[in-house]
Amino acid sequence: MTGLGACRTGQARTPSPPAPGSLDPGGNPVSTIVAPVSRTLPARRVAAPVPVDPAPAGRGPLDVLGVPGQVNLDYAATAPCARAAADAVAELLPWYGSVHRGAGALSRRCTLAYERARQRVGDFLGVRPDDHVIFTRNTTDALNLLARALPSGGKVVTFASEHHANLLPWPVDTVRLPVPGSADAAVRAVDAALRELRRGTDGSAPILVAVTGASNVTGECWPVADLARAAHRHGARFALDAAQLAPHAEVDITALGVDYVAVSGHKLYAPFGVGVLAGRADWLDAAPPYLVGGGATRTVGAATHDVGWADGPGRHEAGTPNLLGAVALAAVCEALTSVDRAALHAREQALLAHLRAGIAAAPDVVELRTFGPDSPRVGIVSFVVAGRDSAQVAAELAGRWQIGLRDGLFCAHPLARRLLAEAAVRSGRADLPPTALRASIGLGSTTQQVDRLLSALATPR
Ligand SMILES: Cc1ncc(COP(=O)(O)O)c(C=O)c1O
């Protein structure tokens, strides 16, 4: 099953609050300290911090590192580091040597580790045999690279709901489609836009449709395979921003039928500073190098412009690469490949449903959404507390409850502003703040952590 399929099957439902003494979906005891939250909560509650359980144990390489007592509900910004990543880095550190630049044993080992990492990440993403897997710094870097590789005269189609990383790198004449009201409407909008762009042409101009797999604001999943099919019907290509989808569900380029995929290591339980652009080789090999310098060249002559650029990933990876980042990311990819991802997904969906149910019941809290309330989504929820400044709420959650989450417009200003306006209409509240809060969960998240947030939201100031 592809990531989208998994996303589709995992619809959030509204469960009953857990009974005291019961187990959460990961088999951890559900906190009995926090009472189920409802709109009719008594006026006074104990504000003392609730003890937080450790991350669920027993998954070995996919245990996440963290600081005891700190509740990380900000996985969508940066996920904690998985043990697999930390171990891979620790193992390689004594072998520290140059990559692609030395004949010594250390250097050869590092070069091999780097190229193996490329292979493993490519396998994880289900690349086709002739696709390139290019290491970048992050998703932003990957999408900027793809923008630079657009053939001349190429057009881009995207949605106003995208993260800035998938809005801003594209040419100024990019078609930015309005935020659709449903997954089906998104597919229809792409179809209509491409028909319009192709009208009166011979259909050969390059067009790229670039869309996210899961929204960083709402967690909602986009109909990736259907969008890619719509693009291909019109002879266009499809780029998937999988920064938020890949940490939660399988992303397989071949199965989804997409042409390019971009991910960030730091959202995939690996360290900062590594990302990937994977996909069709032809545009990438024809484009000027994204970075110029050592490693991107085949030959350099005496004259300034006498340069033969390399083909393949090296063309866009000038300079000494981020070996440890690549190896750490590959280790996480391997660990994720060898576990039952459907089970992980189901566990996360149950926790997400608990979080959303609690948020829906908390006083004055309004959730943000683009599609219907039951549309498939990954472990991300954005919301506002009516009458409260979101930055102040976030600061209070951090200071008083040791809960880390995100506030603001989440680098998706057009979407976040629109959803805030819609939330005001839907809730009938005139006192919604101009920015939002976002809670996001993943591998190390527990019911107790979610309950702590719900308890904090239910506690009067
Ligand atoms: C959907 C989406 N795309 C792209 C990005 C950019 O990722 P990075 O900051 O790792 O480049 C993010 C980051 O939050 C994101 O959520």
Where are these regions (language model features)?
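Pyridoxal 5′-phosphate
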Residues: 4-7, 23-461
